[in-house]
Swiss-Prot record:
One of its GO terms (cellular component) is plasma membrane. Signal peptide: none annotated. Keywords: Cell membrane, Membrane, Transmembrane, Transmembrane helix. This is UPF0750 membrane protein YitE. Belongs to the UPF0750 family. Its main location: membrane.
């Protein structure tokens, strides 16, 4: 019974974290082509160039990276991350369809989107679930090398949104930087809050042979 309750709690956290990310990206950041780094940054670029829906791109890029890292991940970690990716991507697709182009204030949207993004990712990290391919890498580096995962994610994301901005518009670089700084602070804040732990959710990674 106790294990069932813990699994239910984990599922709830994955859904909440994924929906928060999808809400922040779809309603506040993607309408302004603000790259959030990682798969979402690539999704912005693909939508700009080929009009591919953000949700599909976010899912495809993240899952591709996740399968690439499969040999380092235990199946439990892999399935949890896959679930969070799917919830986020579906949320983006739903919010894009239900609330198309409802935003107008760039800086208010930027702040709102960054906070929601940070809350979603931070909540997933807190329960040892990655938010995607880049998130899995940041979490692994944090575990094995030390440091806050949000800061590590910031460094990797900077590379992605610099490439994206060079193609779309260099003006979004400042917006992306501000988004990353805000969301990183929120991620680290949530990650370091003492919450009820789930004992069986210790991150599982395979040792190199």
């Amino acid at each position: 019974m106790a294990e069932l309750l813990m699994k239910a709690k984990l599922t709830f956290m994955i859904v909440v974290g994924g929906v928060l990310q999808g809400l922040g990206m779809s309603l506040f950041l993607f309408p302004h082509d603000i790259p959030t780094g990682g798969a979402a940054g690539i999704a912005v670029l693909l939508h700009y160039l080929f009009q591919i829906p953000h949700g599909f791109s976010v899912w495809a890029v993240n899952v591709s990276m996740l399968f690439t890292a499969l040999k380092w991940l235990e199946m439990r970690t892999f399935t949890g991350t896959l679930a969070s990716i799917t919830v986020t991507s579906v949320s983006v697709l739903i919010f894009d369809a239900v609330f198309p182009d409802i935003t107008s204030n760039l800086w208010l949207d930027l702040a709102s989107g960054a906070v929601l993004l940070g809350l979603g990712i931070g909540l997933l990290y807190k329960y040892k679930i990655s938010n995607g391919g880049f998130g899995a890498l940041a979490l692994m580096i944090s575990i094995y090398r030390g440091g806050n995962p949000g800061t590590i994610l910031l460094i990797m994301n900077c590379i992605i949104f610099m490439v994206t901005a060079s193609i779309i518009d260099w003006g979004i670089v400042i917006q992306a930087l501000i988004c990353q700084v805000i969301s990183t602070r929120v991620i680290d804040f949530i990650y370091n809050i003492r919450l009820t732990s789930l004992p069986y959710l210790t991150p599982m990674y395979r040792h190199k042979k």
